[in-house]
């Protein structure tokens, strides 16, 4: 059941040295390619990074919160073409990233994402500018997030869901505060 998979998925930032198989990576990306996009425009593209030196460099694309990428076996940059869907590219990429995270969990792999929007590189330039140079991207492309994937070297406790009655409303009126 999907709920079991959603409950199983945790943000994993520590990985073993075990390699993610090509078959697993292909399955993850095949699932991502099924992600819905607004008006089925499909502005989302994926860049796979496996080279350890490149992963180390990539882990510095923003201050502090992308360090886990250096320990991942593989990273997937979720990129959008802003000419295809300029008003929905961020949302389309977020849906695709969620599919990737769930697919990784289904394969007993660990994964988490690091967002790019409004992030700064340690040099002071935007993370987006750094990543454009890093990947040699045309201006029409935006890197939305980068997902590190590997075999988990940590276990996370079960996530306690948010309280249903405090977050779900049948009618707004004055209930939402």
Indicate where each model-derived feature is located.
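Acidic, surface-exposed loops and disordered segments
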Residues: 1-177
């Amino acid at each position: 059941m999907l709920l079991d998979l959603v409950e199983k998925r945790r943000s994993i930032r520590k990985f073993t040295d075990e390699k993610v198989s090509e078959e697993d990576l292909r399955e993850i990306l095949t699932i991502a390619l099924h992600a819905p996009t607004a008006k089925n425009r499909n502005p989302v593209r994926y860049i796979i990074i496996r080279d350890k030196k490149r992963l180390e460099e990539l882990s510095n694309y923003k201050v502090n919160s992308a360090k886990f990428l250096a320990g991942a076996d593989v990273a997937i940059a979720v990129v959008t073409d802003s000419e295809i869907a300029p008003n929905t590219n961020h949302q389309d990429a977020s849906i695709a990233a969620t599919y990737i995270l769930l697919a990784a969990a289904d394969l007993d792999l660990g994964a988490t994402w690091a967002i790019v929007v409004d992030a700064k590189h340690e040099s002071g330039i935007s993370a987006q500018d750094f990543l454009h140079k890093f990947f040699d991207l045309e201006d029409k492309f935006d890197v939305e997030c980068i997902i590190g994937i590997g075999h988990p070297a940590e276990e996370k406790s079960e996530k306690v869901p948010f309280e249903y009655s405090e977050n779900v409303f049948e009618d707004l009126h004055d209930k939402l505060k």
